[in-house]
């Protein structure tokens, strides 16, 4: 055991002891002994003791119905507490953030040694535009009630780390920790009802209020300090290197519960939260800025008064209060007069910047650069709308509206027209001054919903929105259709529209679609030199396998960047990544640096999904660290871009992509036993019972694997520890290339090409979380005997995959030898995750044995094991 993790293990041990004490008080000594016996058997099993492994299986098989839920809860709660301890450790004085070089320091050291002009560095920093898009993907299984308790636990651990605590203070904090552990144990960890889209949006607002709101100014102070220390420059007052956007309340793709009314409510709530936060800050500034000296500009504004800063800020405060009252009234459905309200960010910025200039010119820079500067920076990042709301809709839905409309107007059926005919019609109507929508036209409910959403956009402040994303975009007409619908409802601003390319085929055609769009003069005038394109990671990986999808994404980005350079466009690529490797997840810093050269010049936009929001932004200190990782990676990619890959590397990747895709599809699509095996050997069918997000798990209720969303697809394979979507196909391709005598070339690619190196590193992480004996146990206990050969084949492929990757990676004795922190983290969890897996198998067996009977104890325990394994894996989908 590594001594550097002694503090982590100490906190895990303390929290585990307190949980044990709580369980003992609630359920008695005998039950606690049973839990401890299961834990010891799991630990011994993990060390290879076959006899104890069988004892573990037998013990969990023999649990009575009454014991199922408390056993599941004990191990699930322990894993949640381990996550709390780990998140605290990562930012504690003994943790990773304090014992490794700060990402910004590391970057600036590199920049100072590079052959770059100071102006080049200044310009790149000032143009930095990173947009983190919070999404409501249903992968956060931990209840928000418990998340709040976990945050309080973290605060207690932080206090305990202080060196000068008195024994009384120490005892008080430890007592509070014990209270919180007790509260967690006596709280149901599974929410009883699915959250509504508005609930999801409110959770997003809470993340901003509690974590990102305090983190942004602290992060920008640190960035500003580094710039001054290294280059003698200041961050501009209006700079916003990091901004926040959201899909919560705007993403209606496959979610019938996100309606135009919901979007309107979320927009108002977002504004209310922003106004409330700024109101608190302005009130504090009124208290702070009691100075009497001011410049002539401010004096002319406020007249002869002894406290000019307070005078102007009180006016701002009163306007904010009035605005908040008006927004509250709107939310309650009441009519409000158009009073002098704060509706634009500039209305708030102008008086604050006036105060800032005055303080600076009167020799009070130290005061100007205090809280006032922090508020100005929050304003640059969040604005008076708090965040930018994206709208996402399936491309077919826009076509459906136009199809109904053209039939009503007796022009034919838009859906049956050729692409050229669609474009001709759309461009003609876009250029026309007369309205297309008849006043008395009554479309279907689905089409009316699309039109109503466009009306909400048209009637709202443009700054409240991010971009409009079209899922499954395949033709220029998909984009032009949205532009026409927005025009027809009176939208006066140019809403940025991004086609989303999701499948492997769509990614391969992305450049052709963009080329065709740019050949349309009307479209070029509309976009005004700025093009957004979204790259889908989840569905492309589900469609073609991780390795092939990764290469399709890379080539698509390269082609799109080449078009942008040729056409002199600012191209912003929007990355739809998930939390897991199989959905494009993985360490952010490496992922950014592995993108094609030039792909970050137009900014960086990425989704932050589900439980990853909590892991990356769940505490202000952790959020600051992740802001630094993103910032340093994007700056490095733009200022020190990786070299263009060698021609030989392209050839190898083309081959790897082709072989891995063929193999992946030969199993997932063509193997007749695959779907029955998937349904039997994973809890996929049972996942629908878990009230995670507001969105249904399938696009089409009666569809098979192809209609399953990427999240439950990944979630199911993560639960049974086979982790199949993240590796299937890769090893066959790698082995084929090695058999051609190109092993040294693969090793060269690993050492010199960030894209390929990141692929192998992500595979390593997946392999360490996968588990062959547990995957086998799911098969033998749950799948019919005729499906066992397929399971055996897949497990052998997993083992072959591990062997191939270890052969390619230099000087590796074991997986992740060069990343001890991740390795220790996974090792710490296994003795608690393994019993949940074994218990889950037993619960699935009991549930499926009597499908017509409802057993609340079994169902509830099953839900807890699903949540617990997700906590143990530290990701779901």
Swiss-Prot record:
Catalytic site: 137, 542
EC number: 4.1.1.31
One Gene Ontology cellular component: cytosol
GO molecular function, one term: phosphoenolpyruvate carboxylase activity
Keyword Magnesium attached: yes
Taxonomic superkingdom: Bacteria
Similarity annotation: Belongs to the PEPCase type 1 family.
Name listed for the protein in its UniProt record: Phosphoenolpyruvate carboxylase
SUPFAM superfamilies: Phosphoenolpyruvate/pyruvate domain
Cofactor(s) annotated in UniProt: Mg(2+)
Keywords (A to Z) from UniProt: Carbon dioxide fixation, Lyase, Magnesium
Source organism of this protein record: Tolumonas auensis (strain DSM 9187 / NBRC 110442 / TA 4)
């Amino acid at each position: 055991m590594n001594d550097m993790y002694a503090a982590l293990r100490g906190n895990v041990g303390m929290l585990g002891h307190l949980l044990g004490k709580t369980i003992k008080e609630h359920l008695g000594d005998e039950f606690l002994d049973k839990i401890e016996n299961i834990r010891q058997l799991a630990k011994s099993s993990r060390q290879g003791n076959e006899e104890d492994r069988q004892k573990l299986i037998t013990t969990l098989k023999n649990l009575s119905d009454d014991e199922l839920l408390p056993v599941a809860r004990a191990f699930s709660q322990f894993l949640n507490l381990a996550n709390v301890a780990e998140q605290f450790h990562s930012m504690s004085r003994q943790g990773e953030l304090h014992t490794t070089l700060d990402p910004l320091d590391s970057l600036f050291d590199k920049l100072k040694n590079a052959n770059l002009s100071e102006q080049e560095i200044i310009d790149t920093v000032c143009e930095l535009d990173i947009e983190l898009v919070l999404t409501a993907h249903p992968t956060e299984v931990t209840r928000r009630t418990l998340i709040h308790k976990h945050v309080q636990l973290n605060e207690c651990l932080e206090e305990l780390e202080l060196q000068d605590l008195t024994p009384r203070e120490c005892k008080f904090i430890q007592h509070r920790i014990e209270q919180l552990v007790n509260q967690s144990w006596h709280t149901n960890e599974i929410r009883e009802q699915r959250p509504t889209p508005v609930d999801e949006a409110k959770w997003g607002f809470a993340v901003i209020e509690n974590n990102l709101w305090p983190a942004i100014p602290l992060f920008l102070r640190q960035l500003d300090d580094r710039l001054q220390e290294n280059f003698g420059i200041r961050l501009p007052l209006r700079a916003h290197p990091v901004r926040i956007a959201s899909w919560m309340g705007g993403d209606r793709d496959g979610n019938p519960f996100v309606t135009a009314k919901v979007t309107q409510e979320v927009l108002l709530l977002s504004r209310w939260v922003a106004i409330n936060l700024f109101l608190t800050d302005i009130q504090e500034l009124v208290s702070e800025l009691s100075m009497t000296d001011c410049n002539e500009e401010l004096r002319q504004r406020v007249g002869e008064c002894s406290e000019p800063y307070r005078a102007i800020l009180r006016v701002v405060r009163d306007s904010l209060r009035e605005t908040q009252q008006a927004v509250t009234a709107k939310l309650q459905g009441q009519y409000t007069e158009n009073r002098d309200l704060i509706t634009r960010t500039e209305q708030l910025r102008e008086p604050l910047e006036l105060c800032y200039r005055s303080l600076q010119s009167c020799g009070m820079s130290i005061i100007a650069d205090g809280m006032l500067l922090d508020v100005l920076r929050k304003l640059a990042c969040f604005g008076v709308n708090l965040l930018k709301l994206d709208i996402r809709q399936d491309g077919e839905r826009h076509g459906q509206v136009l199809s109904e409309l053209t039939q009503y107007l007796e022009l034919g059926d838009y859906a049956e027209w050729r692409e050229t005919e669609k474009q001709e019609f759309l461009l003609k109507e876009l250029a026309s001054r007369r309205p297309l929508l008849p006043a008395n036209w009554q479309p279907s409910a689905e089409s009316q919903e699309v039109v109503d959403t466009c009306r909400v956009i048209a009637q709202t402040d443009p700054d409240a929105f991010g971009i409009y994303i079209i899922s499954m975009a395949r033709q220029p007409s998909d984009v032009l259709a949205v532009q026409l619908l927005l025009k027809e409802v009176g939208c006066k601003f140019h809403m940025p529209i991004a086609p989303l390319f999701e499948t492997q085929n769509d990614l391969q055609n992305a450049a052709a679609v963009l080329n065709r769009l740019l050949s349309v003069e009307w479209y070029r005038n509309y976009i005004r030199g700025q093009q957004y394109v979204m790259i889908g990671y989840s569905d492309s990986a589900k469609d073609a396998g991780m390795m092939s999808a990764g290469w399709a994404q890379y080539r698509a980005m390269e082609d799109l960047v080449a078009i942008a350079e040729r056409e002199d466009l600012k191209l912003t690529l929007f990355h739809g990544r998930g939390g897991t490797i199989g959905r494009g997840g993985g360490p952010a810093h490496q992922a950014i640096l592995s993108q094609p050269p030039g792909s970050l010049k137009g900014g960086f936009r990425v989704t932050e999904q589900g439980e990853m929001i909590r892991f990356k932004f769940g505490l202000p200190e952790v959020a600051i660290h992740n802001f630094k990782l993103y910032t340093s990676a994007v700056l490095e990619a733009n200022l020190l871009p990786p070299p263009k890959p060698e021609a030989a590397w392209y050839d190898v990747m083309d081959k790897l992509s082709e072989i891995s895709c063929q193999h992946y599809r030969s199993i997932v699509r063509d193997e007749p036993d695959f779907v029955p095996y998937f349904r039997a050997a994973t809890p996929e069918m049972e996942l629908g019972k878990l009230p995670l997000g507001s969105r249904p798990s399938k696009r089409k209720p009666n569809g098979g694997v192809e209609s399953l969303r990427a999240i439950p697809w990944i979630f199911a394979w993560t639960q049974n520890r086979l982790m199949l979507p993240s590796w299937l196909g890769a090893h066959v391709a790698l082995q084929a290339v090695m058999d051609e005598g190109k092993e040294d070339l693969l090793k060269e690619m690993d050492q010199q090409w960030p894209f390929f190196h990141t692929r192998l590193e992500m595979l390593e992480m997946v392999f360490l979380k996968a588990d062959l004996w547990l995957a086998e146990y799911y098969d033998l206990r749950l799948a019919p005997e005729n499906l066992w050969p397929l399971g055996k084949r897949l497990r052998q492929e997993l083992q072959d995959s591990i062997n191939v990757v270890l052969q390619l990676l230099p000087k590796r004795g074991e997986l992740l030898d060069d990343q001890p922190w991740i390795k220790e983290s996974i090792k710490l969890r296994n003795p608690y995750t393994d019993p949940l897996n074994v218990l889950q198998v037993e619960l699935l067996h009991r549930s499926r044995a009597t499908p017509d009977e409802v057993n609340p104890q079994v169902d509830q325990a099953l839900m807890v094991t699903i949540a617990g394994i997700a906590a143990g894996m530290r990701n779901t989908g």
